Amino acid sequence: MKKVSVLGSTGSIGKKTVDLLLKRKEEYQVEALSANSNFALLAQQANLLNAKYAAISDERFYKDLKEDLLGTNVKVEVGAPGLANVASLPVDLSVIAIVGIAGLEPVIKVIESGTKVIALANKESIVCGGKLLLKKAKERSVQIIPIDSEHNAIFQVLQNDDKCVEKIILTASGGPFLNYSLEQLRNITVNQALSHPTWKMGKKISVDSATMMNKALEIIEAHHLFKISPNRIEAVVHPESIVHGVVVYQDGFSFAVLAETDMEIPIAYALSWPERSTLNYKLDLTKQKKLTFQEPDHKCFSSLKLSMEVLNSSSPHTNSIVLNAANEIAVNEFLKSRIGFLEVVEVVKSTIENFDKYSDINSLSDIISVDFESRILANEIIKSKGICSVE
């Protein structure tokens, strides 16, 4: 049996992972689960999977979790130290589905634990950890398998042949506002931004998809994960979301990975790697009336060019951290209807342009410091703009 941990088990990816593990209880021993605040679901999952540990990050819900797990053998951990403890448990495979920069330190703890395979759904840890994180993983022979469908697709192709690659193509659905004008985007509401046409996702990533900042972060992630220069990474809008990624080789051949739009598929791949699992998803191309591709609208969705500017800047690592931090702040403010939809990317741009606390990034504390300063600056920029509420 594979020993596994799932950090962030109550989010959208975490729940999908738990569902898969429940179907295959004879294959996996769940050592630990973690959640930020959803103690009720965490307790339920821990019971169903016979987990040894359950960690709740928000200390306010420690007693609730303890009460829900009374009479079980599940050990409860709490707060940042508790999350660090369960992340440090050596397992065969750790699924990391924590949202945002909060996932970075747990990823590093998992790498240091002796765990050899990380199924990673937290792109922000790669965006902010960059070469520092990947160097640590390489030194300890840790295999990182991306769960994002696009990177998972590229990973699968490059596993077979990573020589003579011309470029990689990441596909983007275009989000719910494909072909909208700038004027139309100006009045987008929170509910509209959360209604994705093809994927079922959490709130933060749904907004990121709507602004196409998700693809911007994925470009930075791909640059690090696959050690490929920014000018050899391309994003193409593909509304049907059937083709997830393409590797173009120098001899003119291109290898694409096709699959239905359900995150269970890349999660199952990561759980089973290096083997392949059996799922009921069978793509029927005869039922696909069309597969369309188009250039992104850089005028309406400038986040893609922003990611390229960051990677080609004189301080790409620092600017990547700034971009991520400012985006997390801006998305949070948009979700509270405190800034408008178009202002999300404007806040990110302005934060990068005005950030001046540059230094070498040599440790986790350096990353945390830049992240902290970026958040302060992003909040100041939002305050200077005033409230722009969209009902």
Swiss-Prot record:
Q: For NADPH, which residues are the binding ones?
A: 10-13, 38, 122, 124, 202
Q: Which InterPro entries match?
A: DXP_reductoisomerase, DXP_reductoisomerase_C, DXP_reductoisomerase_N, DXPR_C, DXPR_C_sf, NAD(P)-bd_dom_sf
Detail which positions bind 1-deoxy-D-xylulose 5-phosphate.
123, 149-150, 173, 196, 209, 214-215, 218
Q: Name the cofactor(s).
A: Mg(2+); Mn(2+)
Q: Which residues bind Mn(2+)?
A: 148, 150, 218
Q: Which UniProt keywords apply?
A: Isoprene biosynthesis, Manganese, Metal-binding, NADP, Oxidoreductase
A molecular-function term among this protein's GO annotations: 1-deoxy-D-xylulose-5-phosphate reductoisomerase activity
Entry's Gene Ontology BP terms: isopentenyl diphosphate biosynthetic process, methylerythritol 4-phosphate pathway involved in terpenoid biosynthetic process
Name the enzyme group at the top EC level.
Answer: oxidoreductase
Q: In which pathway does it act?
A: Isoprenoid biosynthesis; isopentenyl diphosphate biosynthesis via DXP pathway; isopentenyl diphosphate from 1-deoxy-D-xylulose 5-phosphate: step 1/6
What Enzyme Commission number(s) appear in the record?
Answer: 1.1.1.267
Which reaction equation describes what this protein catalyses? Answer: 2-C-methyl-D-erythritol 4-phosphate + NADP(+) = 1-deoxy-D-xylulose 5-phosphate + NADPH + H(+)
Q: Which family does it belong to?
A: Belongs to the DXR family.
Chain's role: Catalyzes the NADPH-dependent rearrangement and reduction of 1-deoxy-D-xylulose-5-phosphate (DXP) to 2-C-methyl-D-erythritol 4-phosphate (MEP).
Protein name (record): 1-deoxy-D-xylulose 5-phosphate reductoisomerase
